[in-house]
Amino acid sequence: DESGFLEEPVLLTNTHSVGAVYEASIQWRRQRGYHPQDAGQGWASLPVVAETWDGRLNDIHGHHIRAQHVFAALDQAHAGRVEEGNVGGGTGMVCHGFKGGIGTASRLLPGGDTLGVLVQANYGRREDLQITGVPVGSRIRGYEMSIQQPSPYQGNSIIVVIATDA
């Protein structure tokens, strides 16, 4: 039987750090006592690790994320407001030719439950940017990023985490 509950951290990182973040999350959970003492080999940790390619603004091949960084992030995790913008996994993001990052939004639903969304934006060409149907991206000139290394990939990515307290 599945519980339907997410019991693991949700971690966001760059493409080449998925393995390091996944392994460190399991180590952190074991060291912090999340591994039931009587579970023996029957306990498994299945962290959720999502990635975006940040090679335009980051030395992605440097493998800079280490276990101590993951431990620090998990130890500092807290309820309430989260940092947004150029932080954590959002540090190397580019969105529609602008510096991207992490953003959030939430709504109080009828009945008192909250729906929250966290987005790590790393997609889109400037000329494709539209706001309420207006093609503003094609009208914006002179605000190009100083680093214009093109992505070697045709596609781009966005991570959307949706959660509720219902």
Regions found by a protein language model. Name each.
Residues 1-166:
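Alpha/propeptide regions of enzymes that mature by internal proteolysis
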